[in-house]
């Protein structure tokens, strides 16, 4: 397996661009201006990188450089989860990107808490079939999984850094949320093995990664979701006891008795936004989808004011696609936030990320895990249960951290890993608590503990 991995990497390296062609490719990918965009002082690039020639799989990226010292600031790759959901629709447009989309999808306005003040941000739509990323082999949409996604994300990075050689050897970090709790550590492991295979200074200079409200271990994620729903008075004592009695948190398929327990839990939830239980739901959405999501039956509501629909209007505009060098064939299809064909046909999903965490903490990478504390879908309870099984020695005991003269959350520092909660944030931490999320990022990039006082 390792030999096959090395052969693939060598083939990728042999196909990388020369310096003259990389400059030309950068010029072709440069975004002059997005429709409705305010004036900005930073450069943007977007386009495609082919990751599988035979199947015609190409991944779409959007790079937003920092407005100051972009030539020295680190590169940060942002990944959203799903699996099958767009990092451009969520991460770039709702969370950490420089722009927000207005309600009519006609204009953009600035996000004053954008993360590109601290790093050059690279958004990647992965795997093929998500967002603008595509495959010429339709069966690929029903054959995606963890392993292929991690491998092709690595191939993307190697080829992308050939196109943008100024980012080779630059400090590099990976950050993601939700099912990117798989993508991020799996890609970090691929990069770590890739760097070990070449005994020289790595062009992908991975320094660390950070995962927010991420899938970590199916057993503890599921158990934690039940505990969270009960402890936050969302389900009854009777239903909670029934879930604990009839649901196996290690099985992929649920029993009939477990399904009944989950059915009653769903009824007791009501129409609550499971991703942010104290936030209003988007009352204008008519196509809300119900997901079991491997934990509890919850209804997928996104944070008001219905930013999902704004993104779908904007990124389906032909002039936006032309400006972003997306959908170059102009084949009519609808850009969506999540590809449910990919989601519903996911082939391989590792049961636990804990073995990878053990391996990469030992490798000396900077690893942070954070949780918005109002998320009932991938809640803080499950994450804490999973982290406790790593049995890492405590360096700095639990304490409150501060942001803008308020408690931003709580944190504990272990040997090789930092855990932090973000008070008042949901599944998408930067949506509800953008300033606290930015404080978190600054501390992470600086390699410093979160502020103890204001």
Curated annotation (Swiss-Prot):
Its main location: secreted. It is found in: Secreted. It holds the Pfam family Peptidase_S10. One of its GO terms (molecular function) is serine-type carboxypeptidase activity. The active site is at 178, 375, 427. The keyword Disulfide bond applies. SUPFAM superfamilies: alpha/beta-Hydrolases. Disulfide bonds join 85-338, 247-258, 282-306. Its EC number is 3.4.16.-. Expression not detected. One of its GO terms (biological process) is proteolysis. PANTHER family: SERINE CARBOXYPEPTIDASE-LIKE 22-RELATED, SERINE PROTEASE FAMILY S10 SERINE CARBOXYPEPTIDASE. Probable carboxypeptidase. Belongs to the peptidase S10 family. This is Putative serine carboxypeptidase-like 23. It comes from Arabidopsis thaliana (Mouse-ear cress). The lineage of its organism: Eukaryota, Viridiplantae, Streptophyta, Embryophyta, Tracheophyta.
């Amino acid at each position: 397996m390792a030999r096959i991995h090395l052969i693939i990497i060598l083939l990728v390296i042999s196909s990388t661009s020369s310096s003259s062609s990389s400059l030309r490719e950068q010029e072709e990918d440069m975004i002059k201006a997005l429709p409705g965009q305010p004036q900005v002082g930073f450069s943007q690039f977007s386009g495609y990188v082919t990751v599988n020639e035979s199947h015609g799989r190409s991944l779409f990226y959007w790079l937003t450089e920092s407005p100051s010292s972009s030539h020295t600031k680190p590169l940060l790759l942002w990944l959203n989860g799903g699996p099958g959901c767009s990092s451009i629709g969520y991460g770039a447009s709702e969370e950490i990107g420089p722009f927000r989309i207005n309600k009519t999808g006609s204009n953009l306005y600035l996000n004053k808490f954008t993360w590109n003040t601290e790093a050059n941000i690279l958004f990647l739509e992965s795997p093929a079939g998500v967002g603008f990323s595509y495959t010429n082999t339709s069966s690929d949409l029903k054959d995606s999984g963890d392993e292929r996604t991690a491998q092709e994300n690595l191939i993307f990075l190697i080829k992308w850094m050939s196109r943008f050689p100024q980012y080779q050897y630059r400090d590099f970090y990976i950050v993601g949320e939700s099912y990117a709790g798989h993508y991020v550590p799996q890609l970090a492991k691929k990069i770590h093995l890739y760097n070990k295979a070449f005994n020289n200074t790595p062009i992908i200079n991975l320094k660390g990664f950070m995962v927010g409200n991420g899938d970590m271990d199916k057993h503890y994620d599921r158990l934690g979701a039940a505990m969270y729903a009960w402890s936050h008075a969302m389900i009854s004592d009777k239903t909670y006891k029934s879930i604990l009695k009839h649901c196996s948190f290690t099985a992929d398929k649920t029993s009939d008795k477990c399904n009944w327990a989950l059915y009653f839990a769903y009824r007791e939830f009501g129409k609550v936004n499971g991703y942010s239980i104290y936030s209003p739901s988007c009352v204008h959405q008519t196509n809300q989808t119900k997901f079991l999501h491997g934990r509890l039956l919850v209804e997928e509501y996104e944070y008001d004011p219905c930013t999902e629909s704004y993104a779908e209007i904007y990124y389906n505009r032909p002039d936006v696609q032309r400006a972003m060098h997306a959908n170059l064939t102009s084949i009519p299809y609808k850009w969506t936030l999540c590809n449910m064909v990919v989601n519903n046909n996911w082939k391989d999903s590792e049961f636990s990320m804990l073995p990878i965490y053990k391996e990469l903490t030992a490798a000396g990478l900077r690893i942070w895990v954070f949780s918005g504390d109002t998320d009932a879908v991938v809640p803080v309870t499950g994450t804490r249960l999973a982290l406790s099984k790593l049995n890492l020695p405590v360096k700095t005991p639990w304490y409150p951290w501060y942001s803008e003269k308020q408690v931003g959350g709580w944190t504990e520092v272990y040997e090789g890993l930092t855990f932090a909660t973000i008070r008042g944030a949901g599944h998408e931490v930067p949506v509800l608590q953008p300033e606290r999320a930015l404080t978190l990022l600054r501390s992470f990039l600086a390699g410093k503990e979160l502020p103890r006082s204001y």
